[in-house]
Amino acid sequence: MPPETAPAPASAPPRTLPHNLEAERSVLGAVLIDNETFNVAAAIIDGKAFFRDAHRRIFERMMDLSERSQPIDLVTLKEELERAGELEEVGGPAYIGSLVDGVPRSTNIEYYAQIVKEKATLRNLIFSANKILGTAYEADQEADL
């Protein structure tokens, strides 16, 4: 007979949700280096796929610029973030400028975006599993098996 309560892990260390900040930075940096890569990334991910909130905001402002057929570069992105009141919240001009540093190759953006998407999918699975667990623990009816 199974126990009535699930044992709590003795000293389970907190776990970080799946993410890859290097891939996120590489997506953003690749777009700043080569605007043509934005459509490749946008076909795979949206802003919600980013783990870091600053990266989500930056990508969403890039999307705004793209939708208005404006170039996406350091100047226009900084201006768009400033207009949205988000420039300092994402790390300021220095952080935006640093995104182009260390981008392995802008032509690899599809692979970087796939990594970001995969990590977002894993996070969503964790959120869904936790929601299911919560619902199961709070259920006041018998489960139909």
Give the ranges of each region predicted by the language model:
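Noncatalytic partner-interaction/assembly domains of nucleic-acid and motor enzyme complexes
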Residues: 1-120
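Non-catalytic interaction/clamp surfaces of large macromolecular machines
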Residues: 125, 130, 134-145
